[in-house]
Amino acid sequence: ILAWNRTYKVPYVIVRPTNNYGIGQYVEKLIPKVCKFLSIGRKIPLHNQGEPYRMWLHAKDTAKAITTIIESGKTNEIYNISGNFEQKNIDTVKKILDLYSKEFVHSKNEDILDLSIVRDGQDVRYSVDDTKLQALGWKTECNFDDELPEIVKFYKDNFIW
């Protein structure tokens, strides 16, 4: 895109959101995948012992960020959308376990989690700065811990995989 702009003067706006979450997310993404594996009784595979960090951003906040960029952003700019909520994958999975069912509360991690997978080259962390977007008046409205119970309930109640 940047090459096309330099060569042909094609205008652009690039958005770079972090990991989105919400109801209707693709089944192979972390939150629905964990719910799927719990529903079918499979161990949950976590790369690199679940230590990598991820920034989470609700899809509603992503949509509002893009609307803000369309209405107030500048052409030929790049906007990061982060949401500024970050945690380890293992911590996300533990929160889902706590919400999913009481039967997992007293389970040992080794009974539920497969922490043996080493993924060479996996990003340990990728954080982005969305100061430019915030300067347009955008801020997150959704809180990960507040939204997660409804999302887990949706996947649990609508298990069709």
Q: Where do the language-model regions lie?
A:
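C-terminal substrate-binding subdomain of Rossmann-fold SDR/epimerase-dehydratase oxidoreductases
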Residues: 38-161
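Flexible, glycine-rich beta-alpha linker
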Residues: 13-30
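Structural element of the ATP-grasp superfamily
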Residues: 1, 34, 133-134
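Active-site phosphate/pyrophosphate- and oxyanion-stabilizing loops and adjacent acidic/basic residues
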Residues: 2, 32, 94, 98
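Conserved active-site beta-strand element of glycosyltransferases/polysaccharide synthases
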Residues: 12-14, 45-46
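Short, charge-rich amphipathic segments
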Residues: 1-4, 28-30, 80
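Conserved terminal C-lobe alpha helix of the protein kinase catalytic domain
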Residues: 31-32, 63
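Active-site Tyr-X1-5-Lys
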Residues: 1-13, 38-40
